[in-house]
Amino acid sequence: MKNWIIIIPLVLLSSCRWVKTKEEQKSKELQEMNAPNIEQENFIHADKFSSRIDYFNWMMLDPQEMKDSTASNVKRIYQHILAENEYTDAKFYVLQDLKSELTEEFNSFQSMDGENSQFVQGEFKYYFEYTSESSYPEIYRSSAENEGQKELIFDFNKIGVDFNYFQIGEVLISPNNQYIAYSADTTGSQKFFISIYDISKNLTQKTSIKKCDGQIIWGSDSRSIYFIESTKNNGKRTSSVYQYHFLESGINKEKLIDTQLQEGFWTIERSKSGRFIFIYLHNNNTVTTFFIDLQRNQKPVLFKEPEKGVRYILGHQKEHFIIKTNQNSSDNFRLFKSKISDFQRSDKWEVLVGHREDVVIEKMDIFEKFIVLEEKVDGLEKFHILNSENGLGHYAEFQEETYSARLVNNNDYYAEYFTYQYSSLSTPPSIFLYEFESRKNNLIQRSEPNSDFDEDDFKTERIWATSFDGTKIPVSLIYKKNVSLDGKAPIFIEYEGSYGNTKELSFKPERFSLLERGFVCAIAHLRGGGYLGEKWHSEGMKLRKVRSVMDLEYSIRHLINNEYGSAEKVFISANGANALIAGTLVNNHPEMIRGAIFKNPGFDLLTRLLNEENINRNEIEEWGNPEIEEQYFYIKSYSPYENIHSAYFPSIFIQCDLNSTKTKFWESLKWVARVREKMTSSNKILVHTNLNKKASSQDKTVALEKKAEQFAFLISLLD
């Protein structure tokens, strides 16, 4: 027996060593795997003003064409995608433990409270809630008088589980509180169907609406909805506004406005009062506005003849329209009041808020007695409250250096208060109720992270970097207070710089996995974004687009020169068309970046803009028109795919979705192929294409796993 007691541990030890050796051998083999061999074909883009050689054009195929799995070119592209995915998976093999560790951190930190929302509509209070296991919301409601008796009335998780891809567009309760209308995309094509759920009968009515853009508006009768449907006609994308009636006598679908001869896109909204529907055609920086008076059951009425570059946004209060407009070169917008009966006489409009050079009117919320304006001063939100009865106004302001505040869930036209969400880079999101008369600020909901989090451990600040032309570029920062600002910390930088968008300066639980590892996290607010208003946007558009790239470069240099972090540890992240800015920077100054992570990046800009089947007017307005010679060559001078040279490229990881409708999967694949061809470094250049398996960004489990992959990749580069 004694001999066996000795032998068994020896056998087990030998077995463990064998398993470990086998695991190490597998890991070694995977790390030594070479990148896929990529075929090259001579293809010449015969553009109007020049020719371009493109050896990887064979990868370019529309996602809809990829559905024909029998076509030889489709098989070829799929084989390449699978080879790239296998190569990426091999390189991530050694990062499995780190990825799992990060996923656990995200889940332990994540609080679903921040995702939840609630609002009162008539006699009911509604709750949209998530659980730690759910990807989609559950809808509850209670009597507005007795909030303790909540009843589950709809669960999107029971619907989403039946689809590989499920993205909710819009969810709206009917005015009579009897129906839920929702839109959803189950293919990733951004074509949404609409269903109507009868709460009392527990019955879903599927409509004939299969290809709308996701927007829904209820009519005041609770028996009709308004939506927008897009089609293609001779290669041109067109959109139309429809009304869909589901009456006892049958169903009727009626086209209200047709844009067959116009470009742009539609948005629709219902006034808080319930009387009007406002319809906006956004085209070439111009907004053409229509309204429907539901009391009179009228057809759409044109508010004003379109004027190039002029926008009219409407609200309703009693017998007046409230008008937000940038007419007469008011880039930051003014606010007017007009009698509904005399709206065409702009000379009779009453000025409520004049134009101010340093204040941007972002949004307005109209109540029976008050108007709340969401304004921006130096990039930070403030709420301007106007008393419509006495004409007096006051502000609700905030004290942090950098934060995010926005109006939310204000559905009651007769309310004596408004609600808003407040968050910052270090402050979890909270919902406040602000009383108009007393000016009291009441906390009604706060998201609490599930870990031992103390916001006092972190420092947030806003600094101003000087760009190449002397322009001051705002940069928002967060880091742990115990991090020494001695030029040694790793820097993780994000940014906005396109389409006038602004990156919300809110609490992101996953960011704290980097902060706890000593990162300084930065968000640069570049020209081309909307942080400082419309003028800031226009300063980084079209023939000024390179300014966005220069702003990013100089923001990074400012951080390094002021010892916020190390020049050898700069990491960058960007998504979609906005990633073009970082892609151009990587081309121009690869030595500045240690590692980059991208999601669906728009790197082949020139080819995309010249593709008439998929381009839309907004992209032309933002980047320029390649059919104009000066703009063509300007775009060609910085478009990332056209400007890859022999260089020491950093490590790069790209995630893309096969069904991405805005920036195409082939933009990532082509760019990676060309970079590998030109790079002089041995750094990893990885691309992984999601083949539509639970790809929706609303699937929180998948979204966190993807983020964990990205961060594992970056953190591994510090070793």
Where are the regions that the model predicts?
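Cap/lid segment of the alpha/beta-hydrolase catalytic domain
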Residues: N157-V171, S183-G188, L203, F436-K440, ...
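Beta-propeller folds
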Residues: I7, C16-Y417, S423-P429, L433-Y434, ...
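Glycine-rich His-Gly loop
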Residues: Y130, N326, S423, E494-G500, ...
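Extended hydrophobic-aromatic, low-complexity segments
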Residues: T288, I313, N332-R334, Q344-W349, ...
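Hydrophobic/aromatic beta-strand patches that form the interior of the parallel beta-sheet core
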Residues: Y126, Y226, I493, A522, ...
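Sec-dependent N-terminal signal peptides
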Residues: W4-L12
